[in-house]
């Protein structure tokens, strides 16, 4: 169904090909997972299937890509639309209508499908993806995860033979991700749909793949094999594989169920060790004191955040209520954040996580209750003053970046924060070594854009740092660097609140977890207590080694050392 024959792609102005000598075939009715570190060309490979590379992106494609017998060099994307359905990393770039139901129908209208067939398929897709209650909602009012489900639904309704998906579960909560992946598996098994999917969160998807295609490095040859074969040598792998490598299991397990069956001996060894007391999950009320063993922090991050008093919380939310039209987005929410504390907000899509962050940064006025950040009321505080109290890195970092170059972004950030010239650029040099001043932010990878947005926000050194889905689009290495950075910021006195669906990140990083449901706080406590008690939000290691309370492979490795 999909065939790559010695394909290389070189973008205009690039000295070397982004991908080189790619050669593989995806038969009809197979789900192939494309994996590899950030920047190795996964999105380029996906774009070559839909014809967006090179017809839309430009550059030179050498070799041959065929989809259902059609050569993508001679068939433009519109001539492949009846065969290939594509969902990219940014769902907002796909939408052309205003409401959910209209968006699901639009692709079929463009292909001239009969109205009665369109109606039936829309209803089927609404039910498949749990969108029935949202059918009349404006797309602009949906959460990021809800928008991602709509984008996936809009390419399912025309019933394409091939689905190309770039990070399809990155903005979805664990339950919604499982539902979407189950739908994809049903399409593959029952209808013979061919799926080529790139995804960084391998803990969610690797068990669904028939085969895995690995791009280990830029320009390196692609490796294709079964999931256990590829995971044994892959530079990127989920926690269940990491634990399997540590324990010496062969073949490597891909699911929690397989790992639990083999974990008896490992649990016995761990039972003889001390109960895990990870630094990330100890409740924090103040910035921890530095220790000799602490890794050296970046020079610019060793300045303490300007906290008025360590005895006072950086942020205090009491009985907060927020309304969006007739929808009550938040109801009687209480939350405090202390200096040096890292809090993970979790919950299903639409639970109110981003709304709570918006209230803390003054973007969303409360309908009831109170919000105070550093003693100020955010929505009544002038932006120039507020930026020194709280900073938000949004779900899409590009929303914060509006200049044409990295240098211009830094100049604007220095001016907005009232900081000395060069402050932001020095932060960028710490976080993004090697990025030139003249680079356009849109040419950066997802991880690089996140780092640039973080540098812009940190220029004002706000005591409270908010991040909305910070690991979206990041590979495991980039996520590890983010964890190190955020720990350093917390050690320097910053309070950090992050909204995330990444249960592995919460287990690795957060002191506290707050779970929201339908706008209300349903759980609030130390990470180990909250996630161990929740089947939906427990990390893989916790599920494998239950009833013992281990959260990460790092804890297990240290205990066995």
UniProtKB/Swiss-Prot annotation:
Matches recorded under SMART domains: AAA
Keyword vocabulary terms for this entry: ATP-binding, Cell membrane, Membrane, Nucleotide-binding, Repeat, Translocase, Transport
UniProt-listed InterPro entries: AAA+_ATPase (IPR003593), ABC_transporter-like_ATP-bd (IPR003439), ABC_transporter-like_CS (IPR017871), ABC_transpr_CbiO/EcfA_su (IPR015856), ECF_ABC_transporter_ATP-bd (IPR050095), P-loop_NTPase (IPR027417)
Cellular compartments per GO CC: ATP-binding cassette (ABC) transporter complex
Class in the EC hierarchy, top level: translocase
Gene3D superfamilies: P-loop containing nucleotide triphosphate hydrolases
Main localisation: membrane
Domain ABC transporter: 2-243, 315-543
Protein location: Cell membrane
Membrane topology of the entry: Peripheral membrane protein
Amino acids binding ATP 2: 347-354
PANTHER family: ENERGY-COUPLING FACTOR TRANSPORTER ATP-BINDING PROTEIN ECFA2, HEAVY METAL TRANSPORTER
Role, per record: Probably part of an ABC transporter complex. Responsible for energy coupling to the transport system.
Protein name (Swiss-Prot/TrEMBL): Putative ABC transporter ATP-binding protein SAV_5847
